[in-house]
């Protein structure tokens, strides 16, 4: 579909927000993956799942709701320890206490039932298991179809507007294609859902670009003015 091809084209570029901002911070939090059983939620085209195998993971399962993503992942990455499965995040099988490490990169804000998802994750993790995920900041997801960056007549950015923050629920945004559905939750809802399902929060990062990242992609300077 159109979304997949545009997404794939953007990710193929060396200098993109994912490579320069989100992923470097994500990777700093990775535990040792040697001999671990891994589940990657929202695996996309499977690159991170393959990375886990290369880092010594025993078995990695990648799930994604997009057939195009899963089909591409299976073509790109072939290994006896890799399994890719098309399944909606909310419908993933509960694997009681069998997973050492669960990862998810920028997918949780597309999931309608966050409480159910985290409950399943908590059940699936073994004792001492780790969940590492990234998602769009609630400051960014709050607005309901309004232009967030306010500009002057010359087009210069004045400030980032936040509205409807406490009004949780469905949002639509135009990202790559029109009317992409996502879900806004407050920071307290996100954190308390983790805590209430028995997970212990060890670290939170709100990424800022490095000097090198700014040289490669100057538009990243906006990230100093609001979380991403």
Residue ranges, per PLM feature:
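Short alpha-helix
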Residues: 170, 181-204
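Class I SAM-dependent methyltransferase SAM/SAH-binding core
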Residues: 39-41, 45-91
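A short glycine-rich, Lys/Arg-flanked "PGG" loop and its adjoining helix->strand segment in the class I
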Residues: 115-130
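A conserved beta-strand element that flanks and buttresses the S-adenosyl-L-methionine
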Residues: 103
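Acceptor-substrate binding/catalytic loop of class I
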Residues: 135, 139-143, 174-188
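Conserved class I S-adenosyl-L-methionine
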Residues: 1-33, 47, 51, 69-72, 131-169
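Short catalytic micro-motifs in class I SAM-dependent methyltransferases
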Residues: 106-109
């Amino acid at each position: 579909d159109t979304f997949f091809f545009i997404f794939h084209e953007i990710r193929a570029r060396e200098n993109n927000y994912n490579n320069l901002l989100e992923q470097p911070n994500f990777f700093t939090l990775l535990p040792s993956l040697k001999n671990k059983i891994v589940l990657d939620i929202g695996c996309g085209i499977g690159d991170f799942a393959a990375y886990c195998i290369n880092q010594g993971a025993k078995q990695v399962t990648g799930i994604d709701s997009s057939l195009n993503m899963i089909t591409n992942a299976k073509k790109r990455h072939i290994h006896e320890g890799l399994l890719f499965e098309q399944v909606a995040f909310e419908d993933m099988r509960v694997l009681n206490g069998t997973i050492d490490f669960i990862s998810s990169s920028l997918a949780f804000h597309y999931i309608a039932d966050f409480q159910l998802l985290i409950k399943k994750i908590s059940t699936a993790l073994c004792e001492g298991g780790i969940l590492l995920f990234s998602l769009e900041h609630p400051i960014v997801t709050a607005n309901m179809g309004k232009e967030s960056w306010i500009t002057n007549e010359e087009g210069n950015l004045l400030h980032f507007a936040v509205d409807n923050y406490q009004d949780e629920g469905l949002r639509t945004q135009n990202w790559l294609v029109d009317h992409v559905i996502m879900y806004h939750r407050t920071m307290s809802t996100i954190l308390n859902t983790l805590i209430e399902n028995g997970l212990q929060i060890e670290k939170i990062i709100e990424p800022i670009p490095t000097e090198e990242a700014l040289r490669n992609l100057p538009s990243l300077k906006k990230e100093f003015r609001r979380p991403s």
